């Protein structure tokens, strides 16, 4: 049988209200976190190939932690900034 995590992670940690303070809207937060999660995922994929095109996680991680959770913790920690673009 599985065990229940004592410290839930993901969308509950960091709290969504804290994350929304870091961006202009909830839609911007979704795009921001998704782009960073893709970069983290690509970084892990490239480790075995010796290609390091992307920057790895900026926070301490655990082996089972998902890239989206890592991205949200980086955003909440103020380690990343979102730059508005002129693209639609």
UniProtKB/Swiss-Prot annotation:
It catalyses: RNA(n) + a ribonucleoside 5'-triphosphate = RNA(n+1) + diphosphate. GO terms for molecular function: DNA binding; DNA-directed RNA polymerase activity. Transmembrane segments: none annotated. It comes from the Bacteria. NCBIfam families: rpoZ. The RNAP catalytic core consists of 2 alpha, 1 beta, 1 beta' and 1 omega subunit. When a sigma factor is associated with the core the holoenzyme is formed, which can initiate transcription. This is DNA-directed RNA polymerase subunit omega.
């Amino acid at each position: 049988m599985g065990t229940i995590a004592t410290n839930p992670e993901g969308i509950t940690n960091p709290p969504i209200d804290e994350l929304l303070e870091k961006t202009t809207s909830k839609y911007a937060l979704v795009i921001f976190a998704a782009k960073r999660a893709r970069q983290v995922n690509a970084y892990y994929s490239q480790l075995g190939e010796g290609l390091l095109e992307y920057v790895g996680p900026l926070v301490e991680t655990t082996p089972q932690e998902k890239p989206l959770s890592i991205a949200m913790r980086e955003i909440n920690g103020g380690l990343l900034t979102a730059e508005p673009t002129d693209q639609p």
